[in-house]
Amino acid sequence: GYTRVPDAYYGAVTSWFSRRHGWDIDREWIIYTSGVVPAVSAVIKALTVPGDKVIVQTPVYNCFFSSIRNNGCEIVSNPLRRTADTYEMDFDALERCAADPRAKVMLLCNPHNPAGRVWTPDELTRLGNICLRNGVTVVADEIHCELVYQGFKYTPFASLSDAFLHRSVTCVSPSKAFNIAGLQ
């Protein structure tokens, strides 16, 4: 396959996120991968050792589970709470999960798949502060960031604060929003 990523790629990504989401990304922050799932797996491998714990908010995209298990890590479920018309984060339970010294990573699905929930800046900030306090790195799968209904606004997790930016990894891809997964 091709190993060189053209300069235009980096310009397209940085320009898109600046225009669409008000997030100014430095080119040096971008690492091209073949997709979000391989990126998530590689990040888990880089940030954990076998036996560490990875927090997920269930229900969640099933590939998260294999990415965690394939790296020898333990899955820690922080179930979302179902209300009459949506899902909500259980922050008290998240605090308990993150307080475990073996918890090293939290996989955040933003917007959430399969719940379709677009997290608010306040919810993301609360989640981020819990993870920061406990030394847990947030790995944000934001592949669905362009698939947001009118009236809702996607917020990139890492854009909320410098502390979050420096203690997180954001994974994105145009494959879902633009139906181009076959181009990989």
What is each PLM-predicted segment?
Residues 58, 77-82:
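Short beta->alpha connector loops at strand-helix junctions that form conserved
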Residues 81-152:
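Active-site phosphate-binding strand-loop segment of PLP-dependent enzymes
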Residues 52, 73, 133-137, 165-166:
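A short helix->loop->beta-strand "cap" motif at the edges of active sites that frequently abuts
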Residues 160-184:
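Active-site PLP attachment segment
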Residues 70-76:
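A short helix-loop-beta submotif of the ANL/AMP-binding
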Residues 1-35, 42:
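N-terminal small-domain helix-loop-helix segment of the aminotransferase-like
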